[in-house]
Amino acid sequence: MSVNPDVAGRSYPPAPPFQVGREAVRGFAEAVQAQHPAHHDVAAARALGHADLVAPPTFAVVIAQRAEAAVVADPELGIDFSRVVHADERFVHHRPLVAGDEVVATVRVEAVKSLGGNRMVTTVTEIADLDGAAVSTV
């Protein structure tokens, strides 16, 4: 089955709330070799004015992928995940993600384009706090 271009513009329900945990921040920082003390040491993060550990900027993808699972699983879109090639990713951070944050991610299919006999699917995931304030766009 090929990717259905008519799904462009579709939004999906929010993923369940995600609690940003200290150990998740530390583990991710270690995995991506982010050495800044604010990712590992609460006192260092607080000295910079943050309430707790600051997640590395790319940590937002952990949250975004939970929402993007709905896109991959959508039978109307028709994605064969075994044929997916990741081409591009951009982050816009409205504020840092900090341990203790509880956030919700909502994804939409921004576009479905033909490219070299294949389809390119562009998604946008909005991450917000529980009050609806923007945190990151992936």
Segments predicted by a language model, with ranges:
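Hot-dog-fold acyl-thioester-processing enzymes
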Residues: 1-86
